[in-house]
């Protein structure tokens, strides 16, 4: 199994319930295909660097997971078909990126405890 990280941007016109529903849909696709979700972060509403589909903001979401390579194709097909997703990027993490992500998670968890 390889470790992947995917960041996707949801359209800003969604309510909180609709946004969570979309995220749960993609997490469900991953778990149904046998992926192990390691981390999930909601980065919130952010300004885009340039307009995408006439929108200047979007809800950013990050999901870090371990999966087989064929799962990525199914996930990205669902990203393309879903009108709520305006942009996405999935990449395979090498061992250094995975170590860095683990350190970052540990730092965030210690900050939350303080």
Curated annotation (Swiss-Prot):
InterPro entries: Ribosomal_bS6, Ribosomal_bS6_sf, Ribosomal_S6_plastid/chlpt, Transl_elong_EF1B/ribsomal_bS6. The keyword Magnesium does not apply. One of its GO terms (biological process) is translation. The keyword rRNA-binding applies. One of its GO terms (cellular component) is cytoplasm. It holds the Pfam family Ribosomal_S6. It comes from the Bacteria. Disulfide bonds: none annotated. GO terms for molecular function: small ribosomal subunit rRNA binding; structural constituent of ribosome. Keywords: Ribonucleoprotein, Ribosomal protein, RNA-binding, rRNA-binding. NCBIfam families: S6. Binds together with bS18 to 16S ribosomal RNA. Belongs to the bacterial ribosomal protein bS6 family. PANTHER family: MITOCHONDRIAL 28S RIBOSOMAL PROTEIN S6 (PTHR21011), SMALL RIBOSOMAL SUBUNIT PROTEIN BS6M (PTHR21011:SF1). This is Small ribosomal subunit protein bS6. It comes from Phocaeicola vulgatus (strain ATCC 8482 / DSM 1447 / JCM 5826 / CCUG 4940 / NBRC 14291 / NCTC 11154). The gene is rpsF.
């Amino acid at each position: 199994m390889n470790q992947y990280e995917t960041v996707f941007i949801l359209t800003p016109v969604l309510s909180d319930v609709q946004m969570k529903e979309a995220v749960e849909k993609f997490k469900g696709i991953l778990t149904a295909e046998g992926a192990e979700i390691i981390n999930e972060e909601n980065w919130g509403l952010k300004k885009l660097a340039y307009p995408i589909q006439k929108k200047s903001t979007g809800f950013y979401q990050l999901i870090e997971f371990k999966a087989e390579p064929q799962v990525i194709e199914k996930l990205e097909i669902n990203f393309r078909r879903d009108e709520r997703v305006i942009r996405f990027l999935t990449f395979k993490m090498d061992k250094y990126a995975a170590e860095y992500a683990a350190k970052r998670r540990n730092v965030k968890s210690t900050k939350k405890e303080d």
